[in-house]
């Protein structure tokens, strides 16, 4: 019975160490993929992507009650998950500046002659075919949302890679612990029994 428990402890140790190594390899590979893919996009922060510069721009645009980024990517190539998230935060402020502080849902659906916009197709400006003209400013939010989602996904993938590395190390340590326990506890009890 002792032999069975000892071998079971060693088997558990091998499985835990193998899973730990697998988690480490996959996580490091995932973080590398995030870095490589972001680098390929050649994203560089604009000069206003510092906390002080964006605060001045937001004030100039009349934005109030808006959470401003506290990170900085001005002049830096965005090639990490954290930098991608920071860049996305600045894009959000830029979109608010471009749309007068309104989000996509707050903007009227159609354009009007007076520039105020409307949600009523009957009051909307018409194109050459007599169809209501869409509010072009809403496209700013469509683009911003798509790009910010991609950047935030890169951040999430990078953080999952970090988590996987920690889990991998924990599994390896647990596997080593199982091996030590199997060897020490069961060997020690067989020596005492003799």
Which residue ranges define each predicted feature?
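Juxtamembrane interface at the cytosolic side of transmembrane helices
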Residues: 1-8, 157-194
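Beta-strand-rich luminal/extracellular ectodomains of secretory-pathway glycoproteins
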Residues: 3-4, 40, 55
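Hydrophobic membrane-insertion alpha-helices, especially the h-region
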Residues: 7-23
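C-terminal TM-helix exit segments that contain a strictly Trp-centered aromatic cap at the helix terminus
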Residues: 19-29, 179-182
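Alpha-helical transmembrane signal-anchor/signal-peptide segments
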Residues: 27-46
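Intrinsically disordered, low-complexity regions enriched in Pro/Ser/Thr
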Residues: 37, 56-58, 157
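Long, solvent-exposed extracytoplasmic domains/loops
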Residues: 45-144
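Short, aromatic-rich amphipathic segments at membrane interfaces
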Residues: 126-171
